[in-house]
Amino acid sequence: MAGKSSLFKIILLGDGGVGKSSLMNRYVTNKFDSQLFHTIGVEFLNKDLEVDGHFVTMQIWDTAGQERFRSLRTPFYRGSDCCLLTFSVDDSQSFQNLSNWKKEFIYYADVKEPESFPFVILGNKTDIKERQVSTEEAQAWCKDNGDYPYFETSAKDSTNVAAAFEEAVRRILATEDRSEHLIQTDTVNLHRKPKPNSSCC
């Protein structure tokens, strides 16, 4: 795959105000704007990178977290290769809503095998001192819901932002490798010469 670029669609989901737009902008442009408005509908940015020898274009989709925008965002779930479920560590309700976001994504993205779909969990706004969700709580949720990787991030100071998105790519590549292996084990070699018949007439 080296030398050839793949396009991966990665979608950020979570309550409004948890910092999804800021995470996307920090990762793609390395900028932080505290005055960002809530996303209406969806928007996306592209980022080219190399992960473990694989050249990848990440198409990162940011979605509106408010309930009233559900009909605008859900049509864009289809075709996603990875979902970054995002909450804010200073907002316990956004953490409690992770399960609802996961269910919404699986339904509208029409995920055929939810158990193997690559989710990555982000606990954002770690720069805020007054936490409502502990690291241990978040790690326990990840373990109980699919053994998902968990990153505590800050779009403001860029903590773990690049690491989280790169892990998303690794998860996608691992999923693709598994499916390619399954396909290869079921194929028949049409170019293999038949063994000569050793029986005599």
Swiss-Prot record:
Classification via InterPro entries: P-loop_NTPase, Rab9, Small_GTP-bd, Small_GTPase
Record comment: activity regulation: Regulated by guanine nucleotide exchange factors (GEFs) which promote the exchange of bound GDP for free GTP. Regulated by GTPase activating proteins (GAPs) which increase the GTP hydrolysis activity. Inhibited by GDP dissociation inhibitors (GDIs).
UniProt-listed Gene3D superfamilies: P-loop containing nucleotide triphosphate hydrolases
Residues bearing the modification Phosphoserine: 34, 179
Sequence positions that bind Mg(2+): 21, 39, 62
Lipidation feature positions (S-geranylgeranyl cysteine): 200-201
Cofactor: Mg(2+)
Cellular compartments per GO CC: cytoplasmic vesicle membrane; endoplasmic reticulum membrane; Golgi membrane; late endosome; lysosome; melanosome; phagocytic vesicle; phagocytic vesicle membrane
MF terms in GO: G protein activity; GDP binding; GTP binding; GTPase activity; identical protein binding
Domain of life: Eukaryota
Binding site for GTP: 17-22, 33-34, 38-39, 65, 124-125, 127, 155-156
Chain positions of motif Switch 1: 31-42
Catalytic activity line of the entry: GTP + H2O = GDP + phosphate + H(+)
Subunit structure: Interacts (preferentially in its GTP-bound form) with GCC2 (via its GRIP domain). Interacts (GTP-bound form) with SGSM1; the GDP-bound form has much lower affinity for SGSM1. Interacts with SGSM2. The GTP-bound form but not the GDP-bound form interacts with HPS4. The GTP-bound form but not the GDP-bound form interacts with BLOC-3 complex (heterodimer of HPS1 and HPS4) but does not interact with HPS1 alone. Interacts (GTP-bound form) with NDE1; two RAB9A-GTP molecules lie on the opposite sides of the NDE1 homodimer; the interaction leads to RAB9A-dynein motor tethering.
Name the UniProt record assigns to this protein: Ras-related protein Rab-9A
Gene behind this protein: Rab9a
